Amino acid sequence: MLKQQSHIVAPIPDELRTRALYTVNELRERGKADKEAIDKLYSLIIDLTENGLDFFFLEPLRRLKAGNMLMSMAKMGINSMFKGSKMVIHKVLKKLDDRSLASILDFIEEIIHEPEAPAQ
């Protein structure tokens, strides 16, 4: 669905992409929204969120060579937002049923892409 719409992109480390796809496959095979699945999914979503926040909010400041004071203020604000996000994610995932788990796994699979080959 995303490829049919305009969208923004945030790079993630290869290790995180590999872990995301492995986790999606593992949890899809198990098909149960039990504590183990929720813990793995929570950890993955938190890492994806943290990478996205860094890229969309801190990377532009790094590219602008923002000073230490501005970077510290930005990090403090983003950390507060991140803590709030973690609480919400945790509350939502605690209430997951098997069908909702499958929907979240579909979404994660939809947003994870391998790097494109360089143009020649």
Model segments located where?
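Protein-protein interaction and targeting regions used for scaffolding, dimerization, and localization
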Residues: 1-120
